[in-house]
Structure formats: structure tokens, C-alpha cells
């Protein structure tokens, strides 16, 4: 069966009252970005549902693109026919014939919002159900648990028919809750944190710290590939790759070994916060899970967070490693994350890092080095790329005026 549209049902958008239009607009933008390589597709957002007019595009590809987009409760491949009973009968029969299996069951569920249509909902159920039964011999009715549920929606603009309902990703449209910077390493935790933030409507821009020659191009590519996995949920993720070699080398030379990790994280957070300010972000997201490593004790978090007053969102803070791994496997980032390429969080790691660093001592150690100049230099040399769900494209000079 050739479907001509996708019918999208909203998730939590149904509870958003006066802000509903804003949420629908944001969802439409995300769907459009996810369909960038399907230029023939047209998107029409309405108060209670959204239609994607395929115009000949591959509906199966469109279906795959819709599944991970947050803000969609469910969707159905559908066909539209005119407000003509015979056309409805023909389309209904074709849909059920295509969907049913031998000795299967079905039901018709009609809804008529267009009152000028000559039959009411019950009459449509009876008329279409009888027509289908007369033309498919091995089919019976089961109104409680049918193998095939034919939905018919009679509206002023036409009659819409579908036989499948596919669960969406639910949540809120990415971007509806504002923008945040995701500190994206090559590990397991930060992509999961990015996924969970997006599910609550946060638009993420990834920040990755790259320290060649200590970290390889493969490590950089792994981070880009992880960002591409996250782009599925919004259509696109902006990624900022920060040159971090010089800062790490200075830290290694000037800072006591036991607090190298703490100072490194503080510099990362300062750079991320400056990017957030320039990009009009509202928060920073990271993959910290309380107590997993030395830098993730409450004392370490306190010392690291002291460089900023910006809200830090930690979606996985209370999860154990197995819980995080389960989500990573679900969103298809786990196999990428465990590839054995070093990132800058693992180089120069001391054998016995302090788990309870003192903020006053950390600030004292830092005071002997002009980290402000090093941070400004790193910001001036950031590489920004746009990671798209369909392809990865390097962005040249797109944010030149910001740095």
C-alpha cells in the first residue's frame, strides 16, 4: 500500500495550554530538520495533530526518521480520500487487504468531526466493516483485540484512513525548554545525559575537548559520531571542538599531580560556560554520576562548580553504571563509546587523585598561571560543525563573529 502522509499525534503537548502553538512549531521544525534529505516532504502542524505530506517520498524512511523525535506520542502511515463513501470503501479495503494475515481479525474505529458527512461514526463502522467482510473471506471481527485496527477520521478537508499505530519517543520537542551546552566526551555517560536532556525538551550543543597528539583523530571522530546519534532526536546538533592541548600541558607542568583532574575539569567548565554565554544557552549538561570516579564526589563537584553560577544539569547523577549502560545500548551509543580511543579526560590522569579537594588550595595553585589567556586562545580556535541526522557537514565561519 502506498501511503501519502504520516499522521502524528502529540505527546505532552496536549497539556501545554496557551503555549501549545509554540511547542507544535518547535516539533515541526525538528521534524523538518530530520527530513532534510527528503525535500519533497511538506509538514502541516495543527492544534491536535500534525500531518507530513510525503509527495512520493519513501514512507518507510520517513517512519524511521520520526521514531526518535521527542514530542511525538504516536504516528500512523495514512491515506487521504475525498468525502465520498465509495472512495472510503475502496481505500479501507485496500488497507485491510495489505495489513491482514490469514484467518485474521479486524475492527473499524471511525470518528466524524465533519458533521455534513452523511453517516455518523457508528454508521461508518457498520458500512465499512460490512464492505471489508464481504470482500475478504478469511477475516472476522474482533472489537476487543483485533489483529488489524482500521481507523477512519472524517474531517472537513477529507477522510483519513490508517491501519497501523507506531509508538513515538514521547517527551517534549527538543528546543522547547531552551538551549544548553553538553560536555560530550567519548565515554558512555555523557551521550546518555544528552539524550535524557533532549527528552525533556532541551536543545543541546555539544562541546568536545580535543588534545592532539595525546588524543587521536579517531577519538575526535568518535565524538562526532556520538553527536550524530544524538542528532536523531532533533534533526541536528551543533558541535564545538575545543583545542585543549596547550591548557592540559600547562596544567601538567604547573599544578600538583593530585589535583590535576580537578583543575582540568574547572578549565573545561570555564570554556563551556563561555561558549554557553556566547550561544545564549541557559545551562550546562554533563554525564557526572555521583561517586563513580574521583572527580565525581560531592567535594570535587563543589570545587569544580565554583567557576560558574550557571545551572549544571546532571541527568544520570543518581544512576549506577548498569542503568546508564542500558540506556546507552537502547540509544545505540554504547558500542561507539567503548571504542578504545583516549579522550582528554583520561590523559595525564594521576594514580591517586584527590577525592576531597579544597577549593581555596585549588584557587591558590591556579593563581600562578594566566589561565584566562589560555582559555581565550582556545575559544578563538574552536572548530564548529553541524551534525545532521542525514549527513555531517563542516560549518565554516558560521560563528566567526562570536569568537
Curated annotation (Swiss-Prot):
ATP binds at residues 183-184, 208-209, 265, 287, 296. Keywords: ATP-binding, Cytoplasm, Nucleotide-binding, RNA-binding, Thiamine biosynthesis, Transferase, tRNA-binding. InterPro entries: Rossmann-like_a/b/a_fold, ThiI_AANH, ThiI_fer, ThiI_N, THUMP_dom, THUMP_ThiI, tRNA_STrfase, tRNA_sulfurtransferase_ThiI. It comes from the Bacteria. It catalyses: [ThiI sulfur-carrier protein]-S-sulfanyl-L-cysteine + a uridine in tRNA + 2 reduced [2Fe-2S]-[ferredoxin] + ATP + H(+) = [ThiI sulfur-carrier protein]-L-cysteine + a 4-thiouridine in tRNA + 2 oxidized [2Fe-2S]-[ferredoxin] + AMP + diphosphate; [ThiS sulfur-carrier protein]-C-terminal Gly-Gly-AMP + S-sulfanyl-L-cysteinyl-[cysteine desulfurase] + AH2 = [ThiS sulfur-carrier protein]-C-terminal-Gly-aminoethanethioate + L-cysteinyl-[cysteine desulfurase] + A + AMP + 2 H(+). PROSITE patterns: THUMP (PS51165). One of its GO terms (molecular function) is CCA tRNA nucleotidyltransferase activity. One of its GO terms (biological process) is tRNA 4-thiouridine biosynthesis. One of its GO terms (cellular component) is cytosol. Its main location: cytoplasm. Pathway: Cofactor biosynthesis; thiamine diphosphate biosynthesis. It is found in: Cytoplasm. Belongs to the ThiI family. HAMAP family: ThiI (MF_00021). Catalyzes the ATP-dependent transfer of a sulfur to tRNA to produce 4-thiouridine in position 8 of tRNAs, which functions as a near-UV photosensor. Also catalyzes the transfer of sulfur to the sulfur carrier protein ThiS, forming ThiS-thiocarboxylate. This is a step in the synthesis of thiazole, in the thiamine biosynthesis pathway. The sulfur is donated as persulfide by IscS. This is Probable tRNA sulfurtransferase. The gene is thiI.
